[in-house]
Amino acid sequence: MRPTHHIIYNPRSAEGRHAGVIRALRAASPPEHVWLETTAPQHATTLAREAAKAGATVVVAAGGDGTIHEVVTGLMSVAAHERPALGLLPCGTGNDFAFASGIPTDLHLAYQRLQTGTARPVDIGRITLPDGRAEYWANTAGIGFDAKVVKRTKRLRWIKGQPLYVIATLLTIAFDHEVI
């Protein structure tokens, strides 16, 4: 049996800048690649969990770091023996996890690697929230300076790509500090 890939695509990642490439990849993909589009926050978590339970061998997060977070949370909610491999098509603004993992930012190359590459383990972090829910991450976790930078990026959406994070970092250094 050929592997089945369930590709969870967030059309709002990077403000939809990758929509044309995603359409082309989708049109050329084999029938065992199931494309699922998210429609709301946390939808990727549900889709990933359902894909795992449906027997997908690979669940692909096609989005940014937020989409990866949601997909990982969905995959970690199923038993280890049911858990498929995680794949990535980097469609976000920063694509930090893709960069750290050596995944090409060219979507055609990344898609080709999904079909020819080999799986490798990644570390997953877990936190249990006060309401009892578990959240997972595969990239980084932060509660201080880095969290302020990410919060600032939400107000600077008119800046595109990697410069968004550089400018948000510089503004956070300049305005969110305490002299001791």
Predicted regions and their residues:
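Catalytic core of DAGKc-family lipid kinases
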Residues: H6, T38, M76-I180
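Short beta-strand scaffold positions
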Residues: A61-A62, L88
